[in-house]
């Protein structure tokens, strides 16, 4: 009898131990899930607040009495570009986290959708700039490859169904390959869409630690001119007339980038020809006037909050609009958080 009671007691204790252990495990899982949920919600709130602060800095940039009208300049020495490490707005501390933010001027990139005019013809300054860009480091595509892919880029962008020369490719060409996306015959919706164009070399899209990929240098959100105050050296060199040796063009671009970084030169960056009138050594270099801008209104925000060890990200492209003294921001593109 005593043995039976002992066995029953041990069984009861075993059941209780298992029950308590499982209950504690479930409580720990629920606590961890709750912590993740709270950290994620806080991270998203931090990112949205950061977006509002960047918009405020961009608005203040236009309200500056010395920075209005056609003489306005936008460059990476301004508070909006330095966010969150700027001194115009005091940010509250994040005791259990951190905020990383990058604000990129989209108008400092090549406006890929400006390659073709509304009537389906090449925009020659844009065409030549893209040829220069793809034919120079870090891409260095040979002339034969450029002669093949440039008509196919045009056919992807223009609205007609007529192939551009012997190397053109319209919908009929893409239909020959099973599973291939057909020719859009319209503006690119996202930069990566270039990879769908027939015979586009994949290597030009690859980014490394020491060089950009093509997707870092082009924008589907802008049209027309390029902000020479924020364009990367690869873009600046590509804007130089092809009659100028490419090595000279790259040296010119590097000199431009160094000049505009110097705070002593910020006041000159509102001049469209500052690279000729203010920067020594390159008076013979003239960038296409229709491609030159010194201000911008479209910005990409890449925000990442790390709260309690949980990271949340937010990517959005904003367009700054000024109407009757009122500054507003419209989302051009937004990725899911």
Label every model-predicted segment.
Residues 4-337:
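Compositionally biased linear targeting/interaction segments
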